[in-house]
């Protein structure tokens, strides 16, 4: 149906992740397709997938295809317009339009902002070197898998659940892995000190080296990452450095549009 003659309101969804698509699934169950013409804009060049299972892809237990939640056919069958690999860069509330990185402009009647979060990055030198990545999306996992095939030594910065999953996955892929954690024990937000120590001993027996009480001062290297320098003088050689120190909500787009934000969109 032509957009200009479609009597339904246009619902634009910014974000093609789990939260946004779960909302659309529920809307469709309530006959939302009769009321709304739905368009989804995603920054990643992929359909919706289960981000939680990226660690299983890294470890070799699943493929990327196996963690897809909504296939291209699902979008088509439900009459959903999908734009991937083209992040929304601005919301114009006055004229009810959005603009994407490629310059595309789309009008809306209703707007759902489901932009998720992004990895935290410590303010240290060397973050931009080749061989440094986060552990947040498919592109990050692809970088890590390539490194595992061509390089030998990995350093993971962050001793929470995500960092441990990254370390274990890279170990399963045959890399020598060291993990740097700022705190004295692992997963201190979930485990007490004795439990964190037990976990560390178990993973140490499995071949992962640990540098606790480790404040990262610099990622060294000239043309690519070569190692991690800690503030106390310890140095860890590395061909790959993975940042896994947490996430923060993607609120910039909403804030720039004049919406109330705090630690998320209010």
Report each predicted region and the residues it spans.
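Rossmann-like NAD(P)H-binding beta-loop-alpha module
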Residues: 143-191, 225
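Residue-level detector of alpha-helix initiation sites
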Residues: 18-21, 45, 117-119, 139, ...
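A general structural signal for well-ordered alpha-helical segments in protein cores
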Residues: 20, 51, 55, 68, ...
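Short, hinge-like loop/turn segments at secondary-structure boundaries
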Residues: 55-59, 130, 151, 155, ...
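Beta1-alpha1 glycine-rich phosphate/pyrophosphate-binding loop at the start
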Residues: 2-81, 169-191
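A Rossmann-like FAD-binding core segment of flavoenzymes
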Residues: 37, 82-99, 106, 173-265
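Conserved phosphate-binding and hydrolysis motifs of nucleotide-dependent enzymes
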Residues: 15-20, 116, 158-163, 233, ...
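FAD-binding core/adjacent interface of flavoenzyme oxidoreductases
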Residues: 1-12, 69-155, 229-231, 242-244, ...
């Amino acid at each position: 149906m032509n957009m200009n003659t479609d009597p339904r309101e246009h619902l634009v969804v910014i974000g093609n992740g789990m939260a946004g698509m779960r909302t659309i699934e529920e809307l469709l169950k309530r006959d939302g397709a009769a009321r709304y013409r739905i368009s989804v804009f995603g920054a990643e060049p992929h359909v919706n997938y289960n981000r939680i299972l990226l660690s299983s892809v890294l470890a070799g237990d699943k493929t990327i295809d196996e963690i897809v939640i909504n296939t291209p056919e699902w979008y088509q069958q439900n009459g959903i317009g999908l734009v991937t690999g083209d992040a929304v860069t601005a919301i114009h509330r006055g004229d009810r339009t959005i603009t994407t990185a490629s310059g595309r402009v789309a009008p809306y009647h209703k707007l759902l902002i489901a932009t998720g979060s992004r990895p935290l990055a410590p303010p240290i030198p060397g973050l931009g070197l080749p061989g440094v990545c986060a552990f947040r999306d498919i592109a990050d996992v692809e970088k890590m898998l390539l490194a595992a095939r061509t390089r030998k030594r990995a350093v993971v910065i962050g001793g929470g659940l995500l960092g441990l999953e990254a370390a274990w996955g890279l170990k399963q892929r045959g890399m020598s892995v060291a993990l740097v954690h700022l705190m004295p024990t692992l997963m201190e937000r979930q485990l007490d000190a004795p439990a964190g120590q037990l976990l560390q001993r178990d993973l140490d027996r499995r071949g992962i080296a640990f540098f606790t009480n480790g404040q990262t001062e610099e990622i060294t290297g000239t043309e690519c990452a070569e190692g991690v320098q800690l503030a106390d003088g310890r140095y860890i050689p590395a061909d790959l450095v993975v940042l896994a120190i947490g996430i923060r909500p993607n609120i910039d787009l909403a804030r720039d549009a004049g919406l109330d934000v705090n630690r998320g969109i209010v």
